[in-house]
Amino acid sequence: MSSSSYNTSVIPSSSSSAQPFFITSSGTGDNDFNRKDTFMSMIQQPNSSAPPPKKRRNQPGNPNPDAEVVALSPKTLMATNRFICDVCNKGFQREQNLQLHRRGHNLPWKLKQKSTKEVKRKVYLCPEPTCVHHDPSRALGDLTGIKKHYYRKHGEKKWKCEKCSKRYAVQSDWKAHSKTCGTKEYRCDCGTIFSRRDSYITHRAFCDALIQETARNPTVSFTSMTAASSGVGSGGIYGRLGGGSALSHHHLSDHPNFGFNPLVGYNLNIASSDNRRDFIPQSSNPNFLIQSASSQGMLNTTPNNNNQSFMNQHGLIQFDPVDNINLKSSGTNNSFFNLGFFQENTKNSETSLPSLYSTDVLVHHREENLNAGSNVSATALLQKATQMGSVTSNDPSALFRGLASSSNSSSVIANHFGGGRIMENDNNGNLQGLMNSLAAVNGGGGSGGSIFDVQFGDNGNMSGSDKLTLDFLGVGGMVRNVNRGGGGGGRGSARGGVSLDGEAKFPEQNYPFGRG
């Protein structure tokens, strides 16, 4: 081929330089569709010649129903020299290894050849009768698998990890563990670190259960330590509590500094007979802590119908009546301890339990004063007050002992600081006169002073006309006049460490709860 002809055939002439170098045919759209079909057939052709899918193995424990079931003894299954050489008695685990060994002895040997025909498969039973794989329907499909299963589940764990002391029955498991042991740690939310995943999972199960249990049952509240019962009957050391009036541990957290310890020096004996309980002091110490959180409730009463205003301003110790009374929880009374009210002629009087603590220190004693006559003359009452004064001079604990009865319209209030009871008449003038007489007998009485007509000594912002508090701790709590009408006459002091000026002064060693 000449150069001119090459140039003519390859390089277009100058006259046709405006035409493109590659000239596409301007045929119809049928040619384009034919090309697409040819291209798609070329792509799909290799897939059409894909090899047939492989036969899947049966899952462990689900053998082929047509398989041959082989049951080997534990000795045979765990034997390391199952196949023995006839020449040197050397054992081998597999028959193929024995055949290869026979070549060294110039003995005829034969390896298993793959057969073109279908070979009947074998399944192996676990020799342990209690194992699930002892059932032919749960047999394992290969000899190695049944061996490892028997070693892991029923055999001795001979291989031990030096790092975590975990033991393995199969050497391959031990080697695999040794490669990763100590390289990864598992940290629980509680801060405990584990090197083993199984230990971590076990710990998390207990830790999560503990967290859930703590969320459902928080810290044991003070209620669980308080014996509560409905109506009458024996109760705990903190008194008989009505429904809904149980103590809560939140109250303790709100008032951390009150330091209440009622068990020092006292023995609380609960008697179920006669629906009452006995409070027996272990010593002659009369100091029992009954102090209001607001300095207003040494003697806390529930108001009755006749002297509502008086009861709202003062507090007297309240005890249960001889008959059943209905205790109901209430937060209207703001005393630290609100003690059960006890009326002889009212069978269903309701006691207002406090919002802070609910208790009625039932210091009931079986004396003859309970059944005394309701009509007592003024002379008898005066004689009783005189006796109280003489006894109080020698024993401060008998300060509130006596005064066993009142008139028909009186409301009975049992105050058991020394074991006796005070019967307060609704006519406050009678009680005022009795208290004045007692003060006169006890320490050279004044013109109108009462043992309850006192003032606050340490608290300058509180006057005697505002509060009625007898503080047995000696921190300045006072008791003011019951009637709010008693004069401020001279106040005497009793013997035995009791002062009638309103401050109960006792020897230092007689403070079982410490000085406030």
From Swiss-Prot:
A zinc finger (CCHC-type) spans 186-209. Pfam families: C2CH-3rd_BIRD-IDD (PF22995), C2CH-4th_BIRD-IDD (PF22992), C2H2-2nd_BIRD-IDD (PF22996), zf-C2H2_6 (PF13912). Binds to RGA and SCL3 competitively in the nucleus. Transcription factor that may act a transcriptional activator of nuclear-encoded photosynthetic gene expression. Binds DNA via its zinc fingers. Recognizes and binds to SCL3 promoter sequence 5'-AGACAA-3' to promote its expression when in complex with RGA. The keyword Kinase does not apply. Disulfide bonds: none annotated. Residues 1-70 form a transit peptide. PANTHER family: PROTEIN INDETERMINATE-DOMAIN 4, CHLOROPLASTIC, SERINE/THREONINE-PROTEIN KINASE RIO. Zn(2+) 2 binds at C188, C190, H203, C207. This is Protein indeterminate-domain 4, chloroplastic. Induction: Down-regulated by gibberellin. Residues 484-495 have a biased composition (Gly residues). Keywords: Activator, Chloroplast, DNA-binding, Metal-binding, Nucleus, Phosphoprotein, Plastid, Repeat, Transcription, Transcription regulation, Transit peptide, Zinc, Zinc-finger. Residues 1-68, 483-516 are annotated as: Disordered. A motif (Nuclear localization signal) lies at residues 146-153. Residues 1-26 have a biased composition (Low complexity). GO terms for molecular function: DNA-binding transcription factor activity; sequence-specific DNA binding; zinc ion binding. A zinc finger (C2H2-type) spans 83-105, 124-154, 159-182. The modification Phosphoserine is found at S73. Residues 196-208 are annotated as: SHR-binding. Zn(2+) 1 binds at C161, C164, H177, C181. GO terms for biological process: asymmetric cell division; pattern recognition receptor signaling pathway; positive regulation of DNA-templated transcription; root development. GO terms for cellular component: chloroplast; nucleus. It comes from Arabidopsis thaliana.
